[in-house]
Regions:
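Catalytic Cys-His active-site segments of thiol-dependent hydrolases/isopeptidases
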Residues: 158-163
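Carbohydrate-active enzyme catalytic cores, enriched for enzymes
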Residues: 2-157, 343-344
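CBM-like, beta-strand-rich accessory domains located in the C-terminal region of large
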Residues: 164-355
Length: 355
């Protein structure tokens, strides 16, 4: 919003000279970021994004936008949602001489695909699932093609943690590593800078589905991921193919500790320096589906029939200190990486969520 705020205020300033800059391009610039928020109006913290940035902080801009675009229904909806959390006491509200009807619940916004940025937002009621496949992001990019985040309407249960302060050692050694993102790590290495490809996107009233591939993140390995969200159920299928054997680590960065009925064994993770950030690691060796409870959610893990796999859990640096209003939603300063590990040429992991 840093440049967008300047553009909007400039457009408002030149109106006195009968210059109208409130065109379709500016309209789309205002709609796009607001369309990508979670149900609690916080933004996913992609790349070097600071965790806890909220649409509520921009409500004054949407007061202007609503007025200049003739009480546009979407901007009116944005204002209604923001004023669920804050009072309408901004100076811009005095200029926008309309009454904003109060609402007490989140309006159901549709699933969306941001083609240029390269990510999708699947929505079902207040449930949101995001998949990121697009351009690397230059100097602020993270090696996290096909990474996901899951928001249950109250908070993230699978998180994209964004960045910590740049001077903190964990910035480059943990938060900017593939391992700290909910995607696939191969042979304990970071993904290469690349751009993935969208294969399909469909939006429904009660969810949607998306599939994308990342053929260039690891030499000789092709990755593909498909998400299907319908009501309160999510199916996540990730596949990888290669002519050679690899160590595949399917990772989910959880905000709550997963609870299993099966016990495990202590393991020390030292596959690469980034793995050293995961403490108190436990491994469970499996050859059949495994289920766990994550807060209020339930998840089932399946791999290809007959294939042995390991489920590794532990603790690692979590959502960085920043916006206190959002951090209060999380009980712990840690995140809880869940790693499904397979050593083979091919990988197919299916997780089914109910949340």
């Amino acid at each position: 919003y840093y440049p967008l705020r300047a553009m909007l205020l400039s457009a408002d300033a030149v109106r006195c000279r009968n210059i109208n800059l409130y065109d379709r391009k500016l309209y789309k610039m205002l709609v796009a970021p607001a369309s990508g928020v979670y149900a609690d109006l916080y933004f996913p913290a992609h790349n070097d994004g600071w965790y806890g940035e909220s649409l509520i902080a921009q409500v004054s801009l949407y007061e202007i936008a609503c007025q200049r675009y003739n009480n546009d229904p979407f901007f009116l909806s944005v204002l209604q949602q923001c004023y669920r959390y804050t009072d309408r006491n901004f100076g811009e509200a005095l200029q926008n001489n309309i009454e904003i009807p109060q609402v007490t619940s989140m309006e159901t916004w549709p699933s969306v695909h941001f083609k240029e940025t390269g990510y999708t937002v699947l929505r079902s009621g207040t449930k949101t699932v995001v998949m990121k496949y697009g351009p690397h992001g230059g100097g602020h990019g993270h090696p996290d093609k096909l990474s996901i985040s899951i928001h249950d309407g109250e908070k993230e249960i699978v998180s994209d943690m964004g960045t910590c302060a740049y001077g903190v050692p964990a910035f480059t050694k943990w938060y900017r590593k593939t391992l700290s993102h909910s995607t696939l790590t191969v042979d304990a290495k970071d993904q290469k800078e690349s751009t993935g490809k969208l294969l399909a996107f469909k939006a429904y009233k009660d969810g949607g589905e998306v599939s994308a591939e990342a053929p260039d993140v690891y030499s000789g390995v092709t990755m593909e991921r498909k998400l299907i969200l319908k009501k309160n159920k999510l199916t996540d299928i990730l596949t990888a193919r290669s002519d050679e054997q690899h160590l595949y680590d399917y990772v989910l960065i959880l905000t709550e500790k997963p609870v299993f009925s099966q016990t495990g064994e202590v393991i020390i993770l030292n596959d690469s320096p980034s793995y050293n950030y995961i403490k108190n690691a436990i491994v469970r060796k499996q050859s059949s589906p495994l289920s766990c409870k994550i807060g209020k959610a339930y998840m089932k893990i399946e791999v290809s029939e007959g294939q042995e796999f390991e489920v590794i859990t532990g603790e690692a640096p979590g959502i960085p200190p920043g916006n206190g209003s959002v951090l209060s939603k999380y009980d712990s300063p840690f995140c809880y990486p869940l790693i499904v590990r397979v050593k083979d040429k091919k990988l197919r992991i299916k997780t089914e969520w109910k949340f």
